[in-house]
């Protein structure tokens, strides 16, 4: 009986030792982790481990972190905008020189589009540019006794600069076709709503011009038909 009691005590002692060792291991592991990453119960700060071995840390104020994303977005937007301007500039600059073949061809195409609109009695013209990021050129045309007043609207300052250098070429092109360029104005429409309104007005005017032309053509054909029709008179 005494021997059985000793065995029980020994087992209890061994179990306690094992439990203590296990607990000590857990504590050691926790201490190790705690040494690597310090936990701060403070909502105003966030700690990011930079180097766990050396236990180096970067501390950010959470209020400032909220400001970082808008700053990055703003810088990114500025970079995109800057790249877009450089991209447009890279396309426009080769056309600025009047000596280049491409510049002359471009000027001829714009002049042809304007002359075509005038001959069709359109009061507006739209010139598409390639690449599409250059936008379009909208031209308002006012004609009276073969005297033209033109207004150009572009989306980019670089295109406006090109149009400024293009005006003498257009003046000569119109003059060769018996049209005098009395006045011209070149402006930039950077506001989306303003440009959208102008586009809507452009297509609306084109629709009404086409409609009037079709009506006039139909009336002319009807008059010609009446003129050509012979009437036989029997007595």
UniProtKB/Swiss-Prot annotation:
Lineage runs: Bacteria, Pseudomonadati, Pseudomonadota, Gammaproteobacteria, Enterobacterales
What the protein does comes down to: Controls the length of the flagellar hook.
Tell me what organism the protein belongs to.
Buchnera aphidicola subsp. Acyrthosiphon pisum (strain APS)
Q: Which residues form the signal peptide?
A: none
Gene symbol of the encoding locus = fliK
- Asked if Transmembrane is a keyword of the record, the answer is no
Naming one, the record's GO cellular component terms include: bacterial-type flagellum hook
UniProt-recorded name of the protein = Flagellar hook-length control protein homolog
Domain of life according to the entry: Bacteria
Q: Which Gene3D superfamilies match?
A: 3.30.750.140
Q: Which UniProt keywords apply?
A: Bacterial flagellum biogenesis
Q: InterPro entries per the record?
A: Flag_hook_Flik (IPR001635), Flagellar_hook_control-like_C (IPR021136), FliK (IPR052563), FliK-like_C_sf (IPR038610)
**What family does this chain come from, according to its entry?**
Belongs to the FliK family.
């Amino acid at each position: 009986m005494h021997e059985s009691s000793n065995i029980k005590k020994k087992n209890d002692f061994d179990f306690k030792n094992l439990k203590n060792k296990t607990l000590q291991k857990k504590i050691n592991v926790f201490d190790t982790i705690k040494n690597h990453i310090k936990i701060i119960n403070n909502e105003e700060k966030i700690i990011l481990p930079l180097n766990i071995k050396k236990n180096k840390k970067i501390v950010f104020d959470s209020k400032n972190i909220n400001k970082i994303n808008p700053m990055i977005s703003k810088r990114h937007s500025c970079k995109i905008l800057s790249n877009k301007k450089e991209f447009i500039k890279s396309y426009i600059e080769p056309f600025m020189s009047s000596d280049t073949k491409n510049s002359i061809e471009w000027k001829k195409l714009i002049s042809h589009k304007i002359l075509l609109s005038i001959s069709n009695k359109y009061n507006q013209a739209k010139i598409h540019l390639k690449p599409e990021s250059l936008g379009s050129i909208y031209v308002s045309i006012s004609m009276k006794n073969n005297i033209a007043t033109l207004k150009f609207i572009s989306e980019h300052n670089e295109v406006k600069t090109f149009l400024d250098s293009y005006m003498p070429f257009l003046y000569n092109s119109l003059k060769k076709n018996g049209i005098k360029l009395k006045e011209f104005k070149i402006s930039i429409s950077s506001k989306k709503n303003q440009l959208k309104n102008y586009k809507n007005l452009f297509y609306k005017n084109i629709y009404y011009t086409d409609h009037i032309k079709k009506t006039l053509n139909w009336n002319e054909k009807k008059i010609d038909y009446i003129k050509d029709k012979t009437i036989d008179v029997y007595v």
